[in-house]
């Protein structure tokens, strides 16, 4: 007892000492809290909402969550005005029948608008901490049997309703998976695709549908489930159906979406758990129940017997792997030398996998097509796809090899393919430089190059780009610091065979590079494309806005996937317009270059002021538009950047 009493006295003395010490600290109330814990003044500005779930439980069938919201600087967000709360549970794999995949069951949602109505109990503790208790009781759902042993999920959509003081709030999503009684993490999950994979093409998943409401793929997967949406709108069916017919190289491989990621621990389900619904969403001509296109399967119980994980993965990724293996086997190196008679000599060497030149004759019978396109003036080509009104000349398109045979005018010299172009419209400045874009298409089977036959499968190989001058001086080259092809590969893959079919197909790699970025890494540019995508357009002479400056905007705008400049552009090189003339914007009509480029995305009338008053010519004649090409005054006021192309100088 004496020792216990002594201890109590000691504690009291220690507490008194601490109190006295704090009193002598100049009246400071201490720090606002450790990093990561809300405290102090609320966030004055909010670009990002970060959610942390502190407690999630279901009591007698009623879900409740406690959560913390901070901004990008870890400051507490106070006064959120409108949220939607949704509840779901996850049926495990096999629970509804042998071979069946796991499946979300969506109980419902409640929208809480502080200024109007709130079905449940919403508490804002005014320090970044919030809580919500649902009004709905999951046990009362007539369609779904609540099971407290299953993994549970609560999702939050925070609306972009401004805070009471007017602070703007971004639309945001968050979710938590938990066990009903303790709130602990469940022992199984269904996180098959990471939002990061979606954003590789979409940049922001929120822009795809539903007015920007849902930016997390897990929200999509939880809502688009049987019983909540109609047949065919289930997430695994809908997404495959939407993407399967897109001509994007990256979608040839399931792993473009189903990739290993901490946010998608179940990414391997695509090959591990085959079902009729999932497989049939891509293989849409198969009717498993009727036995059409496949042996009859009335349920999923027997799928895995044939379609084991390794074999399924090999079938679906093998094509891409084989293509990469073929592409790696050969390369090209080319030179272009201008001659006094205005011709140019093009010499193409075939390289082995190690970059060593080989005798082209040794692989000639395996070449389906070696195609070359030559033009003059890399920054503003003066040879049209068809004859240009300016130079009177069209690009020089020449196959050096076709179906294993040398073409007319082509010779083999010391194992290299040599061709002399017709006379080119050389001039001074940029037009002292000619350039040739080269594509190579090889016959192949699996991972092997094979002799070409009438019905040979083919693989497009690494493209090459060569420059040459008549003067002998260093060539001029088009800027490549605005769009790096790596951004194209995000959607189209690194084996994208550009224009294969009409052309040999061009696979863009470091082989076409002639510049490096700030880190010394080779830039894979897209400048070779202007050999065909000339200022005078392509085959339609402007009617399809085929000039390179416009074509990519037009085609990607039509598809609706590209909605932000930053999805493709790492920079804008506005100085490039100083060396451009007019661009063909309709059949036989031309527009000054800045305006032509802008109107490939924006309708002229939407720009908001008379373009002609700013020096522009819209759909004028060739001479008129080219004379005015450097008279546009757009950049006197406008200073567009990839992150804000509406920016103006103030």
UniProtKB/Swiss-Prot annotation:
Domain of life: Bacteria
Signal sequence, start to end: 1-21
Disulfide bonds: none
Xref: InterPro entries: Decahaem_cyt-c_OmcA/MtrC (IPR020014), MtrC-MtrF_dom_I (IPR054334), Mtrc-MtrF_dom_II/IV (IPR054337), Multihaem_cyt_sf (IPR036280)
Keywords, comma-separated and alphabetical: Signal
SUPFAM superfamilies noted in UniProt: Multiheme cytochromes
Membrane-spanning segments: none
Protein name stated in the entry: Multiheme cytochrome MtrC
Organismal lineage: Bacteria, Pseudomonadati, Pseudomonadota, Gammaproteobacteria, Alteromonadales
């Amino acid at each position: 007892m004496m020792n216990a009493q002594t201890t109590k006295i000691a504690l009291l003395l220690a507490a008194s000492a601490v109190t006295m010490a704090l009193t002598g600290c100049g009246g400071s109330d201490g720090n606002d809290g450790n990093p990561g814990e809300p405290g102090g003044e609320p966030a004055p500005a909010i670009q990002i909402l970060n959610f942390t779930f502190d407690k999630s439980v279901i009591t007698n069938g009623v879900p409740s969550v406690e959560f913390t919201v901070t901004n990008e600087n870890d400051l507490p967000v106070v006064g959120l005005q409108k949220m939607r709360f949704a509840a779901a549970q996850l049926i495990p794999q096999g629970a509804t029948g042998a071979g069946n995949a796991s499946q979300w069951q969506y109980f419902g949602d409640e929208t809480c608008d502080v200024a109007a109505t709130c079905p449940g109990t919403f508490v804002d503790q005014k320090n970044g901490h919030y809580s919500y208790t649902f009004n709905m009781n999951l046990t009362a759902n007539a369609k779904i049997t609540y099971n407290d042993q299953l993994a549970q999920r609560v999702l939050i959509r925070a609306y972009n309703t401004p805070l009471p003081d007017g602070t703007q709030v971004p639309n945001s999503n968050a979710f938590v998976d938990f066990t009903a009684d303790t709130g602990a993490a469940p022992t199984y999950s269904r996180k098959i695709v990471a939002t990061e994979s979606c954003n590789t093409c979409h940049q922001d998943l929120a822009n795809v549908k539903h007015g920007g409401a849902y930016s997390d793929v897990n929200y999509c997967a939880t809502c688009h489930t049987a019983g909540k949406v109609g047949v065919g709108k289930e997430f695994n069916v809908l997404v495959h159906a939407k993407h399967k017919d897109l001509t994007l190289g990256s979608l040839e491989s399931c792993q473009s979406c189903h990739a290993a990621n901490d946010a998608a621990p179940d990414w391997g389900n695509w090959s591990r758990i085959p079902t009729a619904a999932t497989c049939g969403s891509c293989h849409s001509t198969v009717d498993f129940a009727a036995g059409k296109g496949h042996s009859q399967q009335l349920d999923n119980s027997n799928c895995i017997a044939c379609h084991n994980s390794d074999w399924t993965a090999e079938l679906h990724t093998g094509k891409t792997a084989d293509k990469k293996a073929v592409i790696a086997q050969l390369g090209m190196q080319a030179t272009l030398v201008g001659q006094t008679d205005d011709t140019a000599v093009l010499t193409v060497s075939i390289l082995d996998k190690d970059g060593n030149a080989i005798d082209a004759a040794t692989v000639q019978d395996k070449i389906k097509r070696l195609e070359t396109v030559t033009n003059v003036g890399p920054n503003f080509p003066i040879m049209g796809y068809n004859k240009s009104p300016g130079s009177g000349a069209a690009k020089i398109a020449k196959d050096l090899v076709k179906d294993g045979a040398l073409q007319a005018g082509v010779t083999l010299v010391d194992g290299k393919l040599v061709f002399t172009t017709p006379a080119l419209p050389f001039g001074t400045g940029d037009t002292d430089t000619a350039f040739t874009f080269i594509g190579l298409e090889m016959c192949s089977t699996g991972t092997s190059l094979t002799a070409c036959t009438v019905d040979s499968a083919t693989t497009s190989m690494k493209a090459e780009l060569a420059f040459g001058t008549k003067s002998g001086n260093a060539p001029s080259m088009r800027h490549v610091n605005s769009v790096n092809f790596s951004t194209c590969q995000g959607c189209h893959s690194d084996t994208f065979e550009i224009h294969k079919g009409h052309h040999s197909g061009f696979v863009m790699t470091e082989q076409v590079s002639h510049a490096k970025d700030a880190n010394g890494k080779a830039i894979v540019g897209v400048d070779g494309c202007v050999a065909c995508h000339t200022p005078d357009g392509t085959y339609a002479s402007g009617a399809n806005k085929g000039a390179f400056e416009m074509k990519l905007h037009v085609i990607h705008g039509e598809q609706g996937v590209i909605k932000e400049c930053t999805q493709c552009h790492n920079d804008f090189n506005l100085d490039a317009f100083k060396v451009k003339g007019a661009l063909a914007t309709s059949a036989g009509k031309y527009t000054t270059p800045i305006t032509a480029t802008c109107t490939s995305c924006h309708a002229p009338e939407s720009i908001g002021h008379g373009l002609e008053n700013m020096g522009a010519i819209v759909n004028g004649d060739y001479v008129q538009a080219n004379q005015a090409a450097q008279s546009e005054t757009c950049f006197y006021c406008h200073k567009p950047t990839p992150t804000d192309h509406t920016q103006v100088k103030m």
